[in-house]
């Protein structure tokens, strides 16, 4: 357990008088005061103790959320409070801890190489890791961890009550805590981690964020105009010291933008009961981008792809392709509207990665459209993606067996 030392230097004046002279002596002493730390987390980072006023505020927020969602907490939510810098330190330490556990030797380098190949970045693996660490430090006002089921938010040291901004953030994260208890999100996420298959994550995450945003908006609507202005003034600065690539934010567009739009339609159709039912669904990313496909329950098609025997290359990994992947790959070159339009036509897809002794990566991709027209639109989107990049040379063929463009 660490401590905070506050040093105070005091000057003490002592006067002594004799019959012959007067002498003044000055003595300097140092007093050290040690402040006990309430607790530290698993990384040794200081946590702040909630006051009784804060606990009462949490109780009130929990009651508000239960009323709005029509759901009940099975147990009191776990939470940890930090200073802003402490919260950023936790975000960094947590990411690096997961990084060491999640990536096998060479896996991270291949992941970045794949992004290089698709033209998303020119950064090296080390540079990309530093970017993501900075992103973790500066991108979040609060968090809920799906595995340890703990809510974490930054506050100011020595404050007695949560301010309006902090309460708004806490409402959002408390909704996630409630969702985690109702749906057992911890077990669901652990299964995905164990299988290294996160295909179901984007859709459910979008539903979760949509509901949390809605309840958060309900809470903010209880504030009068003066309190809302006060809340906006209390928002801390979350500036990043580096310029982050635009594609970092593409998944968040899905979760908070398109997901929020879908939740509003679900709410109009069946109120909060319908949203609660949606928490148990596993919608595809395509259904989030296109709500009519959500309501029609259009399925994702599993596409079989052949593993090839390639000279000098060996198989390394395989997986499925979803609509978020399409947008992720294409948006930075052809724009959001065209990328999303192509993604909405995806029936299903698969990919296989191969690697050689020089660590060069080769990928095969197989895509199925919802129909022939949708498949053609996806193909045109990829051709436009290639046309926007000078690294490709276009060769038009008109052969006997097939027509098309090679790059």
Task: Name these PLM-found stretches.
Residues 3-5, 10-34:
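Extracellular mucin-like PTS domains
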Residues 14, 32-127:
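A metal-dependent hydrolase signature that marks the N-terminal structural subdomain at the beginning
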Residues 43-54, 154-165, 195-205, 246-253, ...:
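Second-shell loop/turn segments in exported
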Residues 61, 182-184, 189-236:
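Post-HExxH zinc-binding segment in Zn-dependent metallohydrolases
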Residues 65, 168-184, 209-213:
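Active-site recognition of the HExxH zinc-binding catalytic motif
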Residues 104-164, 174, 180-181:
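Active-site scaffold of zinc-dependent metalloenzymes
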Residues 243-366:
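Pan-zinc metallopeptidase signature
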Residues 359-407:
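C-terminal soluble interaction/assembly domains
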């Amino acid at each position: 357990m660490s401590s905070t030392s506050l040093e105070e230097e005091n000057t003490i004046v002592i006067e002594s008088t004799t019959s012959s002279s007067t002498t003044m002596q000055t003595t300097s002493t140092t007093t050290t005061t040690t402040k006990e730390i309430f607790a530290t987390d698993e990384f040794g980072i200081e946590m702040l103790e909630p006051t009784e006023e804060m606990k009462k505020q949490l109780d009130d927020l929990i009651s508000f959320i239960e009323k709005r969602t029509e759901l009940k907490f099975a147990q009191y939510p776990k939470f940890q409070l930090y200073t802003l810098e402490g919260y950023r330190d936790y975000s960094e330490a947590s990411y690096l801890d997961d990084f060491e556990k999640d990536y096998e030797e060479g896996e991270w380098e291949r992941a970045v190489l794949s992004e290089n190949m698709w033209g998303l970045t020119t950064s090296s693996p080390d540079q990309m890791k530093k970017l993501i660490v900075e992103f973790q430090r500066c991108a979040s006002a609060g968090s809920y961890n799906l595995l340890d089921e703990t809510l974490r938010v930054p506050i100011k040291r020595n404050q007695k009550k949560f301010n309006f901004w902090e309460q708004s953030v806490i409402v959002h994260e408390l909704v996630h805590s409630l969702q985690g208890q109702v749906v057992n999100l911890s077990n669901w996420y652990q299964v995905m981690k164990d299988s290294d298959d996160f295909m179901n994550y984007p859709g459910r995450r979008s539903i979760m964020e949509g509901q949390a945003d809605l309840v958060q908006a309900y809470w903010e609507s209880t504030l009068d105009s003066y309190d809302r202005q006060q809340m906006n003034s209390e928002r801390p600065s979350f500036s990043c010291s580096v310029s982050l690539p635009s594609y970092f934010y593409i998944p968040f567009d899905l979760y908070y933008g398109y997901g929020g739009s879908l939740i509003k339609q679900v709410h109009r159709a069946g109120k909060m009961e319908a949203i609660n039912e949606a928490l148990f669904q596993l919608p595809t990313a395509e259904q989030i981008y296109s709500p009519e496909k959500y309501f029609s329950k259009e399925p994702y098609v599993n596409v079989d792809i052949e593993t090839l025997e390639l000279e000098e290359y060996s198989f390394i990994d395989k997986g499925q392709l979803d609509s978020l992947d399409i947008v992720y790959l294409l948006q930075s070159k052809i724009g959001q509207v065209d990328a999303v339009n192509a993604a909405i036509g995806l029936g299903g897809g698969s990919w296989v990665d191969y690697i050689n002794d020089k660590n060069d990566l080769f990928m095969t991709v197989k895509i199925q459209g919802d129909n022939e027209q949708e498949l053609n639109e996806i193909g045109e989107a990829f051709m436009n993606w290639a046309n926007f990049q000078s690294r490709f040379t276009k060769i038009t063929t008109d052969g006997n067996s097939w027509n098309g463009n090679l790059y």
